[in-house]
Design a protein with these regions (language model features):
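Serine/threonine-rich, low-complexity intrinsically disordered segments
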Residues: 3, 91, 166, 188, ...
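Short edge beta-strand/loop segments characteristic of extracellular beta-sandwich folds
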Residues: 37-39, 194-198
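Short, solvent-exposed loop/linker segments at the N-terminal edge
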Residues: 24-29, 183-192
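Activation on beta-sandwich/Ig-like modules and their edge loops
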Residues: 2-153, 158-164, 173
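Short, compositionally biased P/S/T/A/G/V-rich stretches that sit at domain boundaries
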Residues: 169-186
C-alpha cells in the first residue's frame, strides 16, 4: 500500500482537463490547433519537472513537461504546434510536432518522474462520449475537475468553438437547488398558495 509520502506531488491535484483532438475544418488543421490542457485544482503551485503526458504505452507520442510549473488554480496547454497558442498567459508546451491526439479516441496519461501515473483518461468519439468535439468545433471539457475523468458523463462537448485553452471550461456543473417549506400559516379556509422556481 502506497503511503501519502510516496505518491506523486501532483497526484490528485493536476488533471487532464480539456482535449481538443479534432478541430473543425473552419478552425484549421489538426496539426495547428490540437491541444490538451492540464489543470491544477490545488491551492499550491506544482513543479512538473520530470513529468510527461501523452499516449499510453507510447515512447514517441509524449510531451515532456520539464521546466514547467503549473500555478495554483491555473493551467498548462500542451499543443501540437505551440506557436498557435503563444499568446496565452499560461505555460504552453510546444511539442515540436511529436504529440498527436487521435480523432477516433485515445488513452492518455500523465506520468511523474518516478513513472507513477498521476492521471489518465481514455476518450472516444462514439457511444456515450460527446460527438461535437469530433470535428464539430468545441473541445472535450471536463465538467468538474474533481470528478472521474474516465467517465464519459464527466465531459461535455457543446461549448465554445475552438475550446477554452488556458482558461476556465465553458462546461460547468449543473446547479441543483433544494427547497422546503419549514412553516406556514393559513389565513383562511380557502387560501391558495402558488410556488415557482426559476
Amino acid at each position: 500500500t502506497a503511503s501519502s509520502a510516496s505518491l506523486p506531488a501532483a497526484y490528485g491535484s493536476v488533471v487532464i482537463n480539456e482535449i481538443h483532438y479534432n478541430p473543425a475544418t473552419s478552425q484549421g488543421s489538426d496539426n495547428d490547433y490540437e491541444f490538451l490542457e492540464l489543470y491544477n485544482m490545488s491551492t499550491s503551485d506544482v513543479d512538473l519537472h520530470g513529468m510527461t503526458v501523452g499516449q499510453v504505452g507510447s515512447t514517441t507520442s509524449i510531451a515532456s513537461l520539464d521546466s514547467v510549473t503549473i500555478s495554483a488554480g491555473s493551467y498548462v496547454v500542451v499543443a501540437y504546434t505551440g506557436a498557435t497558442y503563444s499568446s496565452l498567459t499560461v505555460p504552453v508546451v510546444d511539442n515540436a510536432g511529436y504529440f498527436g491526439l487521435r480523432n477516433d479516441g485515445n488513452a492518455l496519461e500523465l506520468i511523474d518522474s518516478t513513472g507513477a501515473v498521476v492521471d489518465n483518461v481514455t476518450y472516444d468519439d462514439y457511444y456515450d462520449w460527446p460527438r461535437d468535439p469530433d470535428g464539430g468545433g468545441p473541445s472535450l471539457e471536463l465538467i468538474d475537475a474533481s470528478s472521474d475523468n474516465n467517465l464519459a458523463s464527466s465531459w461535455r462537448g457543446h461549448g465554445i468553438s475552438g475550446g477554452t485553452p488556458g482558461a476556465a471550461n465553458s462546461a460547468q456543473p449543473d446547479i441543483s437547488m433544494g427547497s422546503s417549506i419549514t412553516s406556514y400559516q393559513t389565513v383562511s379556509s380557502t387560501a391558495t398558495a402558488t410556488f415557482q422556481l426559476n
